[in-house]
């Protein structure tokens, strides 16, 4: 069967977006892994699925699958692309959209020239909300790594789990070595996204993220939210911060006790069709 899809990206964090309202398809783990292959498939960090909502207050249901086929709760760059996709495909004429995710409701607002502002919901910090194994809540935790190496982390749930550590320079940070250890650390029973943040000043940070089930990506929207909130909680950052990632910049806003707002661009790369039989086992 032919499957229609759209390739999009948010700051280089790239997606295959599939409308399963207007067409039907079954995409299992092995099929998603084959589609994600950058040599023999479409190639993407995440697969984004558009479905009818299960709850009356939502316009759409938004499902996210990593390149390894695992389903995850949230993707910030993805939700911006999702919002643009459903609007440009005329699945809705709304510019303020209510979207159901595994993590709850998010509310993207479409702006001009592909820019989208998203209400990302409330950050969570308690260990059982991440989830993270700890005897009691703390501002910072020490994580034991291989070769007697320790790092200091903050933990934040932005619809998906994040560990944030501050580094002197993101360019020289050992993301490839430390990232996988943090991602699969036994204290994170559902694994975690590992963020490495360099504070430039109180309104500007640089960030690299080793994403759960994907590896390091050019950008991570929820990671940018988690890092900014972590820095704000530590008193290092103002309430509106520019987060600079390899793929570009996001603006993150947060006031204590309020929701997090993320603003950033989206890019429509191309539309395509493929014969799904070649990707199924």
Swiss-Prot record:
One of its GO terms (cellular component) is cytosol. The active site is at residues 75, 220. It holds the Pfam family DAP_epimerase. GO terms for biological process: lysine biosynthetic process via diaminopimelate. Substrate binds at residues 13, 46, 66, 76-77, 160, 193, 211-212, 221-222. SUPFAM superfamilies: Diaminopimelate epimerase-like. The record marks 162, 211 as: Could be important to modulate the pK values of the two catalytic cysteine residues. It is an enzyme of class 5 (isomerase). The keyword Transferase does not apply. Keywords: Amino-acid biosynthesis, Cytoplasm, Isomerase, Lysine biosynthesis. Pathway: Amino-acid biosynthesis; L-lysine biosynthesis via DAP pathway; DL-2,6-diaminopimelate from LL-2,6-diaminopimelate: step 1/1. GO terms for molecular function: diaminopimelate epimerase activity. It catalyses: (2S,6S)-2,6-diaminopimelate = meso-2,6-diaminopimelate. It comes from the Bacteria. It is found in: Cytoplasm. Catalyzes the stereoinversion of LL-2,6-diaminopimelate (L,L-DAP) to meso-diaminopimelate (meso-DAP), a precursor of L-lysine and an essential component of the bacterial peptidoglycan. Homodimer. Belongs to the diaminopimelate epimerase family. This is Diaminopimelate epimerase. It comes from Acinetobacter baumannii (strain ACICU).
């Amino acid at each position: 069967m032919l499957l229609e899809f759209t390739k999009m990206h948010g700051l280089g964090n790239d997606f295959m977006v599939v409308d399963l309202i207007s067409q039907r398809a079954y995409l299992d783990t092995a099929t998603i892994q084959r589609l994600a292959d950058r040599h023999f498939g479409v190639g993407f960090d995440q697969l984004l699925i558009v479905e009818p909502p299960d709850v009356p207050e939502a316009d759409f249901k938004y499902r996210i699958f990593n390149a390894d086929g695992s389903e995850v709760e949230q993707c910030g760059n993805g939700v911006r692309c999702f919002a643009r996709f459903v609007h440009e495909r005329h699945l809705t004429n709304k510019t303020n959209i209510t979207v159901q995710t595994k993590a709850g409701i998010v509310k993207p607002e479409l702006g001009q020239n592909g820019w989208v502002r998203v209400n990302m919901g409330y950050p969570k910090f308690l260990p059982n909300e991440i989830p993270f194994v700890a005897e009691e809540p703390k501002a910072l935790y020490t994580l034991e790594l291989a070769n007697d190496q320790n790092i200091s982390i903050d933990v934040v749930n932005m619809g998906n789990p994040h560990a944030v550590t501050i580094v002197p320079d993101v360019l020289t940070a050992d993301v490839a070595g430390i990232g996988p250890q943090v991602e699969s650390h036994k204290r994170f029973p559902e694994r975690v996204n590992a963020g490495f943040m360099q504070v430039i000043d109180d309104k500007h940070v640089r960030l690299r993220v080793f994403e759960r089930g994907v590896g390091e990506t050019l950008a991570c929207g929820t990671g940018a939210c988690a890092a900014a909130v972590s820095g704000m909680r530590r008193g290092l950052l103002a309430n509106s911060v520019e987060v600079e990632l390899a793929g570009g910049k996001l603006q993150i806003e947060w006031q204590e006790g309020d929701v997090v707002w993320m603003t950033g661009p989206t890019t429509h790369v191309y539309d395509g069709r493929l014969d799904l039989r070649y990707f199924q086992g």
